[in-house]
Amino acid sequence: MATKLIVGLGNPGPKYLWTRHNAGFMVLDRLAHAIGASVTRKSFSGVFGEGAWHGERLLLLKPQTYMNLSGRSVAEALRFHKLPLCDTIVIHDDLDIPFGRVKVKEGGGHGGHNGLRSLVQELGGAGFVRVRVGIGRPVHGDVVNYVLTNFSQDEMADLAHLLDGTLDLLESLLTAGLPKTMSLYNNKDLLAP
């Protein structure tokens, strides 16, 4: 059974629970629930759990270091489990993708995302798979404030569809591979009827 480390990026604590920056945590929680795993064990400067899905052993990690230091947590987990970077899937929010869409890719720059910046720095490279959950850009105002505010009421009404669609993407990634998943999901509106 192959092993994958799946990381959801976010900020710890109830204050950040429903913020846009916590989209990675939300998807990871949805995945854990779907596979009957519990992500509660304190380990690797985060909370950790394990489960299996489609013949893969999944190590689930939510760094508790705050976004800007997420790389430390992920590096600890990879070292302990002796996993290569290519067996890591990182789920994070993305300002450059509209709400309701997700994209998946391997490698690339951090695009100004401090969590990704920390990962690339601590891991010594960017050769991990990224599941980019669209949160859109603010019409007015500061990006930092925007990512740390809760989803709007309209977005909250559609959030379950976005999370379920992202879970479908993860399932495709594990069963069909990256190229097929990219072609299926990278331009798909998950909120379309």
Swiss-Prot record:
Claim: Transferase is one of the keywords in the record: no
Keywords, comma-separated and alphabetical: Cytoplasm, Hydrolase, RNA-binding, tRNA-binding
Major location (coarse): cytoplasm
Pfam families: Pept_tRNA_hydro
Annotated site (Stabilizes the basic form of H active site to accept a proton): 93
Keyword tRNA-binding among UniProt keywords: yes
Gene Ontology molecular function terms on file: peptidyl-tRNA hydrolase activity; tRNA binding
Catalytic residues (UniProt): 21 (proton acceptor)
Catalytic activity: an N-acyl-L-alpha-aminoacyl-tRNA + H2O = an N-acyl-L-amino acid + a tRNA + H(+)
Sequence intervals crossing the membrane: none
Organism, scientific name: Geobacter sulfurreducens (strain ATCC 51573 / DSM 12127 / PCA)
Gene3D superfamilies, sorted: Peptidyl-tRNA hydrolase (3.40.50.1470)
Protein name per Swiss-Prot or TrEMBL: Peptidyl-tRNA hydrolase
EC number: 3.1.1.29
Subunit structure, interactors included: Monomer.
GO cellular component terms, A-Z: cytoplasm
Any one of the GO BP annotations: protein quality control for misfolded or incompletely synthesized proteins
Location in or out of the cell: Cytoplasm
Chain positions of site Discriminates between blocked and unblocked aminoacyl-tRNA: 11
UniProt family annotation: Belongs to the PTH family.
Function: Hydrolyzes ribosome-free peptidyl-tRNAs (with 1 or more amino acids incorporated), which drop off the ribosome during protein synthesis, or as a result of ribosome stalling. Catalyzes the release of premature peptidyl moieties from peptidyl-tRNA molecules trapped in stalled 50S ribosomal subunits, and thus maintains levels of free tRNAs and 50S ribosomes.
Binding annotation for tRNA: 16, 66, 68, 114
